[in-house]
Amino acid sequence: MPDRLVSATLALRDDGTLVSPEFGELHRGASGTLARAHRTFVAGNGLPARWQRRRTFTIVTTAFGAGAGFLAAWVAWRDDPARCERLHVVAVEPHPFSRDDLHRAVSHMVVDTTISADVDALLDAWPILVPGLHRLEFDEGRVVLTLAFGDTIDLLKKLVARADAFFLDGAAASGDGIRALAKLAGEHATFATHAKSDDVKHALGETGFTFREVDDRLVGDYAPRWRARRHEPPRALPVAARRAIVIGAGLAGCAVVERLAARGWDVTLIERHERIASEASGNPAGVFHPLMTRDDNVASRLTRGGFLHALARWRALERAGHAFSRSTHGMLHLAESADDFARMRDAFDAFGPPSDYATLLDADAARAHLNLPVAQGGLLFPHGGAVWPAGLCVAQYAAAGERVRLLASTCVARLERRDDTWHALDDTGATLADAPVVVLANAGDAARLAGLRHVTLQPVRGQLTLLPPGTTAPLPCPAIGDGYAVPLDDGTLLIGATFEPDDTDPAMRAAGHAENLDRVRHLLPGLIGALPDPATLRGRVAFRWVVGDRLPLIGPLADETQATANARALGGAQARDLPRMPGLYGAFGFGSRGLVWAALGAELIASQLEGEPWPLERELADAVDPARFLIRALRARRVGSAG
């Protein structure tokens, strides 16, 4: 059963002081909390001098609280003309405030009106209070706050980052917390803390930190006398120039293009069709929602993270003037049976989500919400819905601006690496494009291009059906269950879709329309009146590519040849132990969840390339690692010399 996220609370003392049982008194005034945060944490870590003229700088703060440490770092960064190009702050918080309480808390401790716009931006971006990592961007993406909601020690052990400075506070000022931080520390990382107990000093010393007392705080450096870590924190990929090739211009590829361009990369986008979003990404709409299970398993956590990250990225696109069509009235996931509704209820009760994430509706409430008869209740996701995927791809492509070059109607026959550069070749052997980095986002063809023998992708044919305007009852929001129904802007109702593994026939079938009609009639009995002749209906056929474990393939690709040659030594390997193809990454195998996973996958790849903190926990990154099937084969002694 998942650990519920319990938010912090605020109270007002008789003397007017605002207090939080979790954080104590919140001091008012410029000489109070914010100034102390600057003195203790910012100055205590030698900032701003240490981040000057660097490309990126990463701070890990172990207790976000009301955001004083983050705001102090942000203000110092903006005031420094020699600041780093990109400032990352990773902040762990077991008991986050609600947006309203955070507003009260910050307003109470900050009286400097010059940062009121920063406070407003933080409040506007404040995420839904559910466990996991939440990435927020400010100052046009140059200041990045990654909030980690949940148990402090547990999350510190799961973070992937190379920290340059630690703001050490809260539960992390302990032996377990400091040991977790030591695994994140980059060379010459520094720390500052108010904690000065003997236990803290002992933990710092035994994990490689030097320390000294300065006024009311402890400061120091990570300077181990011997190597004590099996794995070093991630570094940026060394490249002579920030240039990349992305193959495939669907949801996965366009998301990668936008994220790389935002970091200053020049990208060549290669697409075999005449235009972007021509395959499954060209469907009139796709449904978009998280997954909820009683045990909050890997798929649930990954889907939740992808869902919330995509929402944040889409809002950023819209604010930048790159709008696209998407529904805004939520989505209802209807149970398929009484047993299915019981499972939904168990998952909802175990997770305990806030109402802005999900609400459980019984059959009567679901009926009232849709104004249609339904057999069962379900889960209402107020931020779920339907998205026009091609419009999203166009928006992401437009956001990349002059940093992207499109080669349409172009097929890549093979990849070849010469020195430190990848070459994309056509069937004559001519070079189409070259770059130090290639990202394969071309679904079923990715494994062939990369020569992956331990990845198996299965094609799944999906046929959707379009019902003309005026032939169905009004539907206020998309509904899914065993099938789905999505109202489009022009009054057309999209229903579907068939699920036909290993069927690669692109022709439309009347039988597929009949199957979709039958499925939706059971889902929403009052939606469709007189059944139309399936042979007269319009629709679309597209193909999704799925992996056996139904999780995507995102990240650096393994060097299978080298791994095979060293199979015996790699029999107990972790993902970090495997040899990788330098500069070759994948983002494919998304199945029917491209809308949910594409943005998060793109952010992960961009973060891996740049040596930035990852936007998801190590366990989840390992779960989508394209090398995971090779790892399983190595452990089972089914590879090369291990066999």
Curated annotation (Swiss-Prot):
Domain of life of the native organism: Bacteria
UniProt keyword list: Cytoplasm, FAD, Flavoprotein, Methyltransferase, Multifunctional enzyme, Oxidoreductase, S-adenosyl-L-methionine, Transferase, tRNA processing
Gene Ontology MF, one: oxidoreductase activity, acting on the CH-NH group of donors
Localization terms from the record: Cytoplasm
Spans annotated as tRNA (mnm(5)s(2)U34)-methyltransferase: 1-223
Cofactor(s) needed: FAD
InterPro entries on file: FAD-dep_OxRdtase (IPR006076), FAD/NAD-bd_sf (IPR036188), MnmC-like_methylTransf (IPR008471), SAM-dependent_MTases_sf (IPR029063), tRNA_MAMT_biosynth_bifunc_MnmC (IPR023032), tRNA_S-uridine_synth_MnmC_C (IPR017610)
Keyword tRNA processing included in the entry's annotation: yes
This enzyme's EC code(s): 2.1.1.61, 1.5.-.-
GO cellular component, one term: cytoplasm
Main location: cytoplasm
Family matches, as Gene3D superfamilies: D-Amino Acid Oxidase, subunit A, domain 2, FAD/NAD(P)-binding domain, Vaccinia Virus protein VP39
Region: FAD-dependent cmnm(5)s(2)U34 oxidoreductase, residue numbers: 247-643
Recorded catalytic activity of this chain's protein: 5-aminomethyl-2-thiouridine(34) in tRNA + S-adenosyl-L-methionine = 5-methylaminomethyl-2-thiouridine(34) in tRNA + S-adenosyl-L-homocysteine + H(+)
Reported function: Catalyzes the last two steps in the biosynthesis of 5-methylaminomethyl-2-thiouridine (mnm(5)s(2)U) at the wobble position (U34) in tRNA. Catalyzes the FAD-dependent demodification of cmnm(5)s(2)U34 to nm(5)s(2)U34, followed by the transfer of a methyl group from S-adenosyl-L-methionine to nm(5)s(2)U34, to form mnm(5)s(2)U34.
Family: In the N-terminal section; belongs to the methyltransferase superfamily. tRNA (mnm(5)s(2)U34)-methyltransferase family. In the C-terminal section; belongs to the DAO family.
Protein name as catalogued: tRNA 5-methylaminomethyl-2-thiouridine biosynthesis bifunctional protein MnmC
Taxonomic lineage of the native organism: Bacteria, Pseudomonadati, Pseudomonadota, Betaproteobacteria, Burkholderiales
Primary gene name: mnmC
